Amino acid sequence: MDDDLALQRAVALRSGLDDYELDDADLDLLEVDGEDADAIAFLPALPVLAIVGRPNVGKSALVNRILGRREAVVEDTPGVTRDRVSYRAEWNGRRFTVVDTGGWEPDARGIDASVAAQAEVAIDLADAVMFVVDAMVGATSTDEHVVRLLRKSDKPVFLAANKVDDARQEPSATELWSLGLGEPHPVSALHGRGVADLLDKILKALPDVSAVAKQEVGGPRRVAILGRPNVGKSSLLNKAAGEERVVVNELAGTTRDPVDEQVELGGRVWRFVDTAGIRRRVHLQQGADFYASLRTSTALEKAEVAVVVLDVSQPISEQDVRIIDLVLESGRALVLAFNKWDLLDDERRRYLEREIEQDLAHVSWAPRVNISARTGRHLEKLVPALERALESWETRIPTGKFNAFLAELTSAHPHPVRGGKQPRILFGTQSTSRPPTFVVFTTGFLDPGYRRYVIRRLREVYGFEGTPIVLNMRVREKRKH
């Protein structure tokens, strides 16, 4: 059926709905038939403020105080902020970027050494630095080491003497003149005391446009990297970004805050959101892991497409399936990345294919890439998979074509008779994209099996690779004359 004929048929079907009881919401829906794509804007790079200091001096609490919301994971355990994390902030009408870093320990071993290295990188990428010291502890040898690094940076440095909760404790802040960084600013991240005055001074030193940050594009496609702890999410982002962006350690769960990074892949910019992994038994978790899990869900809400990373060296688990189901519930596009593929032998590969067929049958439509995040093998296949998934996610089927599709489908395979009645599809329309959401007006309730059949046929005819499809029903009765 050509487009003109399909449109004429749809108009006739639509007019037939006037014989049925329609409410205001129905009428509003029937008027919708346009694109809903967001415009992409280009924004100047915002000035960057890095917040650095030893572990557990209150850096993340200060970030939360500046932002006015709980963003950085805060706990009374040294080293709980392990990655460099960027947040957008605004103060007195000025927008800027805040970078929270893990704590410094000059002689750190293992993961602490990685965090220290990232803090040094953060200083290089900042326009100004807030150096946080615990005024109640005073200057330590570690602080002296940090001061030497700060002096090398030649950046404006503001000394925040934290944990000064009232005027009686201000002499402790005064003692920090000894560090040679100029005036110590007594603040209390816990109570907010002194933070506003310090921010006023910092903003005077920050340029209007960052001298160091990459140019920020307003609309890079947003990708959430999801998966169980230690499946290779951070390694995947590091390989894509070409730098040690996220602390990678064999200890499961070493990523606690989602970390955004703009990465150029396949000739375009993407914004990857690396997450903490979704933990089992959330209600049993310690504080930091609990909040990080909540943040993972938030990261997914901010994303347009999710890459779920699965470790092929282990069987597909219930937790893997739950993470995939979370993506489906959120309505995001989906790509499956099977990591550590280079480690598979033939026997494990055959067994894995059977697992995929059995456990992931409900997402057989998702693009699949077999990669090695560690070596970067087949990473180039990720971009075409993301592009296909996003294109499907934004697809809109014209109303005429959709109704022609429904007519052909119901003619070849009408709904079964139930209780002496056979529900009919009167008319259909696509209400939105992102994900594609269809509404059908019917004379009766459609069986779940029949709805699955409609969705399956939609995929066969139109593709929709990499996106969930939502099919809603509106059962309507004829008007009583």
Swiss-Prot record:
<feature type="domain" description="EngA-type G 2">
    <location>
        <begin position="221"/>
        <end position="394"/>
    </location>
</feature>
<keyword id="KW-0547">Nucleotide-binding</keyword>
<dbReference type="GO" id="GO:0042254">
    <property type="term" value="P:ribosome biogenesis"/>
</dbReference>
<dbReference type="InterPro" id="IPR031166">
    <property type="entry name" value="G_ENGA"/>
</dbReference>
<feature type="binding site">
    <location>
        <begin position="162"/>
        <end position="165"/>
    </location>
    <ligand>
        <name>GTP 1</name>
    </ligand>
</feature>
<feature type="binding site">
    <location>
        <begin position="100"/>
        <end position="104"/>
    </location>
    <ligand>
        <name>GTP 1</name>
    </ligand>
</feature>
<dbReference type="GO" id="GO:0016887">
    <property type="term" value="F:ATP hydrolysis activity"/>
</dbReference>
<protein>
    <recommendedName>
        <fullName>GTPase Der</fullName>
    </recommendedName>
</protein>
<dbReference type="InterPro" id="IPR016484">
    <property type="entry name" value="GTPase_Der"/>
</dbReference>
<feature type="binding site">
    <location>
        <begin position="53"/>
        <end position="60"/>
    </location>
    <ligand>
        <name>GTP 1</name>
    </ligand>
</feature>
<dbReference type="Pfam" id="PF14714">
    <property type="entry name" value="KH_dom-like"/>
</dbReference>
<keyword id="KW-0690">Ribosome biogenesis</keyword>
<feature type="binding site">
    <location>
        <begin position="339"/>
        <end position="342"/>
    </location>
    <ligand>
        <name>GTP 2</name>
    </ligand>
</feature>
<dbReference type="InterPro" id="IPR006073">
    <property type="entry name" value="GTP-bd"/>
</dbReference>
<feature type="binding site">
    <location>
        <begin position="274"/>
        <end position="278"/>
    </location>
    <ligand>
        <name>GTP 2</name>
    </ligand>
</feature>
<feature type="domain" description="EngA-type G 1">
    <location>
        <begin position="47"/>
        <end position="210"/>
    </location>
</feature>
<dbReference type="InterPro" id="IPR005225">
    <property type="entry name" value="Small_GTP-bd"/>
</dbReference>
<comment type="function">
    <text>GTPase that plays an essential role in the late steps of ribosome biogenesis.</text>
</comment>
<dbReference type="GO" id="GO:0043022">
    <property type="term" value="F:ribosome binding"/>
</dbReference>
<keyword id="KW-0342">GTP-binding</keyword>
<feature type="binding site">
    <location>
        <begin position="227"/>
        <end position="234"/>
    </location>
    <ligand>
        <name>GTP 2</name>
    </ligand>
</feature>
<dbReference type="GO" id="GO:0005525">
    <property type="term" value="F:GTP binding"/>
</dbReference>
<dbReference type="InterPro" id="IPR027417">
    <property type="entry name" value="P-loop_NTPase"/>
</dbReference>
<dbReference type="Pfam" id="PF01926">
    <property type="entry name" value="MMR_HSR1"/>
</dbReference>
<keyword id="KW-0677">Repeat</keyword>
<dbReference type="InterPro" id="IPR003593">
    <property type="entry name" value="AAA+_ATPase"/>
</dbReference>
<comment type="subunit">
    <text>Associates with the 50S ribosomal subunit.</text>
</comment>
<comment type="similarity">
    <text>Belongs to the TRAFAC class TrmE-Era-EngA-EngB-Septin-like GTPase superfamily. EngA (Der) GTPase family.</text>
</comment>
<feature type="domain" description="KH-like">
    <location>
        <begin position="395"/>
        <end position="477"/>
    </location>
</feature>
<dbReference type="InterPro" id="IPR015946">
    <property type="entry name" value="KH_dom-like_a/b"/>
</dbReference>
<dbReference type="InterPro" id="IPR032859">
    <property type="entry name" value="KH_dom-like"/>
</dbReference>
